[in-house]
């Protein structure tokens, strides 16, 4: 059974939040941090993992991502604050190593 994740990336000042979905959270966070893709997170320097949820079904994760993206910022902040009041980078200390 493969795990899937919905996650929030924030910039240094916590003024911008990006919501994404992935089946490999460690790799995806690494891609955001290294700006592998020149998209939203690279443009707005969203390189802190501040929140994530785990799912056993990718379809549930995608549905949750859509639900969260449709919500207002206050609701997103409440989710983050419930588990990460200081908005610390939850990936701090992770070792990033990939064979490609």
Map each language-model feature to its residues.
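Short, surface-exposed polybasic/aromatic micro-patch for ligand or macromolecular engagement
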Residues: 55
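Exposed acidic/Ser/Thr-rich ligand/metal-binding surfaces
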Residues: 76
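C2H2-type zinc-finger recognition helix
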Residues: 58
């Amino acid at each position: 059974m493969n795990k899937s994740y919905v996650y929030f990336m924030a910039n240094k000042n916590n003024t911008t939040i990006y919501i994404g979905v992935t089946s490999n959270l460690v790799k995806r966070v690494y891609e955001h941090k290294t700006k592998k893709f020149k998209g939203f997170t690279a443009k707005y320097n969203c390189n802190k993992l501040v929140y994530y949820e785990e799912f056993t079904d990718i379809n549930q994760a995608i549905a949750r991502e859509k639900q969260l993206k449709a919500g207002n910022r206050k609701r997103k902040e409440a989710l983050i604050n419930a588990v990460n009041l200081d908005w610390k980078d939850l990936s701090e200390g992770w070792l990033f190593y990939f064979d490609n």
